[in-house]
Amino acid sequence: VATLIRFCHNHGLTQITDRPQWYTVRGGSRQYVRRMLAALQHDGRHEARLNTPVLGLRRVEHGVLLQMAHGTEQFDAVVLACHSDQALRLLGSDATPQERSVLGAIRYQPNQAVLHTDASVLPRRQAAWAAWNYERAADAGGNQAGVCLHYLLNRLQPLPWQQPVMVSLNPVRPIDDSQVHARIEYSHPVFDLAAIEAQSQVVTLQGQHRTWFCGAWCG
């Protein structure tokens, strides 16, 4: 319950009046990457390698060995900016018991996001349209069969179109295929009691064996 209340509070969902003002970055989140790359290139002391997947890693006395498709290279330290289960796979047999305990405690669930223009998923009354629209499905017996969030992007982004553009997370009813522009599969952490306890232990891992962790799963 505390996790849900914290999430709602952080997103301004616990207040009726004085709603938060949404802001967006012009050009989208890719601007973060462009600014970081520009800073690294301007610095002259760092090198950014794109499209270079890391297959595994191993900590040694004076650094960290990263295994890539073209071979293995040694670095001073490593920051694992990924899901905890992905970090655990990269560490492999090199993971410590504490890392296995903390990283392995967090479960993930698959989620599908659908980008579309099928406005039938929104409330019948246009006056009720919001940035976030909640929909609950029930089975024949009236029991809850699924929950979906429809994000109305026109309320969140300065889109140049009048037509409603939505992102539906885990749709509970069919969306008109002719109005679907993209389907994206995600994996999100499940913040249950085990995950919350693991989050409190992440700090004990940071910097150990020249390894750092970050990501939404850290809390």
Where are these regions (language model features)?
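Active-site/ligand-binding neighborhood in enzyme catalytic cores
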Residues: 1-58
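Short, loop-centered acidic/histidine patches that primarily coordinate divalent metals
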Residues: 12, 27, 170-172, 214-218
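A structural signal for the hydrophobic beta-strands that form the central parallel beta-sheet
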Residues: 48-50, 80, 213
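Mid-domain catalytic core of redox enzymes
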Residues: 52-189
